[in-house]
Amino acid sequence: GQPDVDGDLEMGNGSVEYYWTYDRHAYTLLVNIGNDVYSAYRQDDVDRGPFSDDEAVGICQTFVTSRDAVIVDISSTISDMARERGLTNEGTINLALAFVQSIEYASDEATAGHDEYWRYPVETLYERAGDCEDKSFLFASVIEAMGYDAVILLFDDHMAVGVACPGASGTYYSMGGSKYFYCETTAVDDWELGRAPEEYDSAHVVQVG
């Protein structure tokens, strides 16, 4: 699916609008992504996969871009939204998770013609679609930019994100004395922090902050 963009996008200063709901409230987020910014990520010669487990662990951090200006802008806006609603840390994480979950799930085969093709967060935002890896990198980037501690959770045929949130409950993975609660970025039915599919058990936990 092509993004809903205004006519200025061809000039390199367009915008993409996102709509999602969380806890019965509707949210709108306008994201400005210049063509030059998108193209720089799109044309980056980084390896896009497929990867062995060891390779995947080693390269995950490259795709988490929490210092990117677009990501910083999004994280700031979502933080403001959460403050206005008086959300707790857990609620704030879930608000950001609901945003990423609202982005269309699409397989790499459908979107890139490859079995595996990892995207940078800006690519996923611009294209308004991604698979579990793409959406996990986006969510981890936004959450890290918001000041939380995130890890990538690597499974045999899946990827998710873990976020440290003291006081939270549910499925978590331990690393370095912290509990990272499972976040399913591809869910479509309001799965929140700590809720994980039963089939995913042991994971490679990759620090990306």
Q: Where are the model-predicted features located?
A:
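Hydrophobic/aromatic-rich core segments of domains that either
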Residues: 134-208
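Extended, composition-driven regions rather than compact fold-specific motifs
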Residues: 4-22, 66-80, 84-90, 102, ...
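A residue-identity detector for tryptophan
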Residues: 20, 51, 118, 172-175, ...
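Short low-complexity stretches enriched in small and charged residues
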Residues: 48-56, 115-120, 139, 182-184
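Intrinsically disordered, low-complexity regulatory regions in eukaryotic proteins
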Residues: 8-31, 113, 123, 193-196, ...
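Secondary-structure boundary elements
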Residues: 57-127
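Solvent-exposed, polar/charged alpha-helical surfaces in well-ordered, non-transmembrane soluble domains
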Residues: 94, 98, 130, 134-141
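Linear, non-domain "peripheral" regions
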Residues: 1-72
